[in-house]
């Protein structure tokens, strides 16, 4: 079946819209679908996502499609950009409408709620083994991406042909450098754990601990990410790249990050519900914390920063007490013997 679009993007929030704008700015015919018909009608009329990316006009190659069946019929390349807690649900909706030659990539960052499973496992459970899968991840704030400010990301998947296609599709000499990576697991994990550590960095700054503490927390957070990744068979080198260190530093240090701002509010004394309300959008790290903590416990991986953030979010511990517990942990070597 011939494509009438180069790619269909599922998810018309800030990040899905930004990726659609970036793709269309490359000259690729891009369809953008979202679950809310009223929102989609507004996007089509305004030629701009005023709710999430105000003032950034859609390129001519970007089209809005409110009908999921039509959106999925238009292209065999499907980019899913929805919150992690509805990732499986969206795939269930899409499954009977997918073309037989469909290829699925996602930019969703997180794990499956409750179980802590990787999204590749969710996708395989829903879709079976028929379709090539891929993930893209890296330091990409939606607004900067949509504005055409330069950054770099990584792409990994189950099929090298599809991965290489995505590199070519997404890459732009002016705005986006794209690296191929063969670590499918590592790229997915980095996007989930960095959200958790960003909440911790925000809490640290909210308490008033300063730049030294923030940097120490980021560094030890990277250690926790690498530990968990290696336990799942990921390549430790992945976490020194765009989907690891790159995304971690970005999310922990800039107030465009909803996760960091959520942590800041907690560190300044807000309760969890009030802090979430202040953000006004999905704070992926809130759910990610429980998911990552669950996964680490199941695998027996030590993640003390993640554990303390979990206790703040779900057990009512104060950020100050969490910091005290981290600082009073047993002394040990930074590089334990292998």
Swiss-Prot record:
Subcellular location, record wording: Cytoplasm
Gene Ontology cellular component list: cytosol
Positions bound to sn-glycerol 3-phosphate: 109, 138, 140, 194, 247, 257-259
GO biological process: carbohydrate metabolic process; glycerol-3-phosphate biosynthetic process; glycerol-3-phosphate catabolic process; glycerophospholipid biosynthetic process
Main localization category: cytoplasm
Active site: 194
Enzyme Commission number, as recorded: 1.1.1.94
Keywords: Cytoplasm, Lipid biosynthesis, Lipid metabolism, NAD, NADP, Nucleotide-binding, Oxidoreductase, Phospholipid biosynthesis, Phospholipid metabolism
GO molecular function annotation: glycerol-3-phosphate dehydrogenase [NAD(P)+] activity; NAD binding
Catalytic activity: sn-glycerol 3-phosphate + NAD(+) = dihydroxyacetone phosphate + NADH + H(+); sn-glycerol 3-phosphate + NADP(+) = dihydroxyacetone phosphate + NADPH + H(+)
Residues reported to bind NADPH: 14-15, 35, 109, 142, 258, 282, 284
Keyword NADP: yes
Alphabetized Pfam families for the sequence: NAD_Gly3P_dh_C, NAD_Gly3P_dh_N
Transmembrane helix listed as a keyword: no
PROSITE patterns on file: NAD_G3PDH
Pathway(s) of this molecule: Membrane lipid metabolism; glycerophospholipid metabolism
Main function: Catalyzes the reduction of the glycolytic intermediate dihydroxyacetone phosphate (DHAP) to sn-glycerol 3-phosphate (G3P), the key precursor for phospholipid synthesis.
Matches recorded under NCBIfam families: PRK00094.1-1, PRK00094.1-2, PRK00094.1-4
Family as reported in the entry's similarity comment: Belongs to the NAD-dependent glycerol-3-phosphate dehydrogenase family.
Protein name, entry field: Glycerol-3-phosphate dehydrogenase [NAD(P)+]
Name of the gene this protein is made from: gpsA
């Amino acid at each position: 079946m011939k494509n009438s679009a180069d790619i269909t993007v599922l998810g018309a929030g800030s990040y899905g819209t930004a990726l659609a704008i970036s793709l269309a700015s490359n000259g690729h015919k891009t369809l953008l679908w979202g679950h809310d018909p009223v929102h989609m009608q507004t996007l089509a009329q305004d030629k701009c996502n005023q709710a999430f990316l105000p003032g950034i006009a859609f390129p001519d190659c970007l089209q809005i499609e409110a009908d999921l069946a039509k959106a999925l019929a238009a292209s065999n390349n499907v980019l899913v950009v929805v919150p992690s807690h509805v990732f499986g649900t969206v795939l269930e909706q899409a499954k009977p409408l997918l073309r037989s030659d469909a290829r699925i990539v996602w930019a969703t960052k997180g794990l499956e709620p409750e179980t802590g499973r990787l999204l590749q496992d969710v996708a395989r459970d829903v879709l079976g083994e028929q379709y090539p899968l891929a993930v893209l991840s890296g330091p990409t704030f939606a607004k900067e991406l949509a504005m055409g400010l330069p950054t770099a990301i990584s792409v990994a998947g189950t099929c090298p042909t599809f991965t290489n296609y995505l590199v070519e599709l997404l890459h732009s000499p002016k705005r986006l450098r794209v690296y191929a990576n063969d670590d499918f697991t590592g790229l997915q994990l980095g996007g989930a754990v960095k959200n958790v550590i960003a909440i911790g960095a925000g809490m640290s700054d909210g308490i008033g601990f300063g730049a030294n503490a923030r940097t120490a927390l980021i560094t030890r957070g990277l250690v926790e990410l690498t530990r968990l990744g290696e336990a799942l068979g990921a390549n430790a080198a992945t976490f020194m790249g765009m989907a690891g260190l790159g995304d971690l530093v970005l999310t922990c240090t800039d107030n465009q990050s909803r996760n960091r701002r959520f942590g800041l509010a907690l560190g300044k004394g807000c309760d969890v519900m009030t802090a979430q309300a202040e953000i006004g959008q999905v704070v992926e790290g809130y759910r990610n914390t429980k998911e990552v903590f669950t996964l680490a416990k199941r695998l027996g991986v030590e993640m003390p920063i993640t554990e303390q953030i979990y206790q703040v979010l779900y057990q009512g511990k104060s950020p100050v007490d969490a910091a005290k517990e981290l600082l009073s942990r047993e002394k040990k070597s930074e590089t334990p013997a292998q």
